[in-house]
Structures are given as structure tokens and as C-alpha cells.
Amino acid sequence: MLHYCRSRAFGYIRILELEGVKKGSLTAALDRIVGDIKDSDGVVIDIRNNPGGDDSTAITIINRFCDRKRVAFHRKTKIGPGEDAFTKRKTWHIEPQGDAQFTGPIVLLTCDSVFSGGEAFALAIKQLPHAFGLTLRRR
């Protein structure tokens, strides 16, 4: 699900999917990754071709890159065929969690083949003032 590497100055994190990971193993992986990259000059987070998964997994990851609590996004879910058949609006927040956060510059790599929880990840990380995104076309 998560792969990372680091040069002297920069970290690179590849998020393959946001589904099927246990919270304990995700927390341990994030502790290791953020601990290793926390003094980097910048980090590239790559979610290209991510099939998605749980919004809560996306938020858990982004929380390790937050400097303070912020609104991530609002969501309604379609629940039926009618034009107005949606759940009530739910507000999702991002906020610092874990032993360490990385709050330096972040570049998000995404493309037109990112879905579901991957889209939520992209929406939420855009709320961080130290993050910006690059959308790449698939060939």
C-alpha cells in the first residue's frame, strides 16, 4: 500500500491504494516513514493510478502532514435513484496526529486514473498551504 524512499534532500512516498489496510499497520508504517523524512527539504507524494479505497485511510495519512486542524472537504453520498436522494452533508477534517509530522513542501502527483479515496486524498491535501499538486496525463 505505501512505499517510500529518500535521497539526501527529498522524500518520495508512493500510495498504491487506500483499501484493506489495518489501522495498526498503517500507523506503524507512517511512524517509520514520517520519522525518516521529517528533516527532508521536501516530499513528493505519488497517488497516480490509485484505485481508491477508504476516505478514512486517506485522512489518516494526510494527518501526518498537518500543522493544525482544517476542514478537508464536505461529502454527500448518493443513496437512491431520486434527484435528491443523498445523505446529509458530512464534514471531514484533517489535523496533526502521531509522534511526528512533516510540514515542509509537498508535491502531490496525480493523474486522470485516481478514484474514490484517492480523489478524497487529493481534495484534502490541497487544504495544506505547503502542498501543491501536479496532474499528469496517462499515455
Give the location of each predicted region.
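Loop/turn elements at helix/coil->beta-strand transitions in domains of secreted/extracellular proteins
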Residues: 8-10, 39-43, 68-70, 103-105, ...
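A mature extracytoplasmic/lumenal domain signature
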Residues: 17-19, 49-51, 112, 137-138
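Terminal peptide-recognition signature
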Residues: 13, 45, 65, 106, ...
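Extracytoplasmic/secreted envelope proteins and their assembly/folding machinery
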Residues: 27-34, 58-62, 103-106, 118-122, ...
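Short beta-strand/loop segment at the start of cytosolic alpha/beta domains
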Residues: 1-24
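A short, well-ordered alpha-helical element
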Residues: 21-41
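Short acidic catalytic loops
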Residues: 13-14, 36-52, 109
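Gly/Ser/Thr-rich loop/hinge elements
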Residues: 52-109, 113
